[in-house]
């Protein structure tokens, strides 16, 4: 999907959701349509279809920017964890999609710049959560290292280096060694960097 088309689709979706939210009697909470859209976008980030991740990612960024009260970063990350669970019975391509989905969800949260709007304590907790998640995914598959590094650099630009380093060290110590050296899907992984470029 071409970038211009993704942006157009995201803008159109946001417009519809703004109308639905304004007509709903759910002040401060997501209306039914908005809640459904959140679930659909997050789950869509694990889609194996070409261009789907970029499209869903662009829409999720705009949704997070547009609905700061109705859509929390915590709820998005929780949806990610619930809908993209890794299981031992998964085949290689399915696990690959789940891992890419988790990385792309983190990317959307970071690109929305929502972290900068939070108070220091909750922001630190969320940054640590994001760093842990990204390090976990990078440790599972080597073909995610390039994409994950780009996203971590974006996060670094939003936080004082000393704070982020401390969080990364804590996350690394807690994660432990669990690297999977299987490079399946490595060729396709490079193109996905577009979402965070």
Task: Please place each PLM-identified region on the residue numbering.
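Eukaryotic alpha-helical solenoid repeat scaffolds
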Residues: 1-11, 16-29, 35-197
């Amino acid at each position: 999907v071409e970038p211009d088309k993704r942006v157009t689709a995201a803008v159109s979706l946001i417009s519809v959701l703004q109308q639905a939210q304004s007509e709903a009697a759910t002040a401060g909470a997501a209306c039914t349509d908005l809640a459904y859209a959140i679930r659909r976008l997050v789950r869509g980030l694990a889609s194996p279809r070409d261009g789907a991740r970029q499209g869903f990612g662009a829409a999720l960024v705009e949704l997070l920017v547009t609905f700061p009260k109705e859509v929390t970063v915590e709820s998005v990350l929780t949806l990610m964890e619930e809908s993209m669970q890794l299981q031992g019975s998964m085949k290689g391509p399915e696990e690959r999609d789940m891992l890419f989905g988790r990385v792309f969800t983190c990317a959307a949260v970071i690109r929305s710049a929502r972290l900068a709007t939070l108070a220091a304590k909750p922001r630190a907790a969320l940054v640590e959560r994001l760093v842990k998640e990204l390090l976990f995914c990078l440790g599972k598959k080597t073909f995610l290292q390039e994409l994950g590094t780009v996203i971590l650099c974006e996060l670094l630009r939003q936080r004082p280096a000393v704070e982020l380093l401390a969080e990364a060290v804590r996350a690394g110590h807690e994660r432990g060694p669990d690297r999977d050296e299987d490079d399946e899907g490595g060729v396709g992984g490079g193109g996905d960097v577009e979402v965070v470029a």
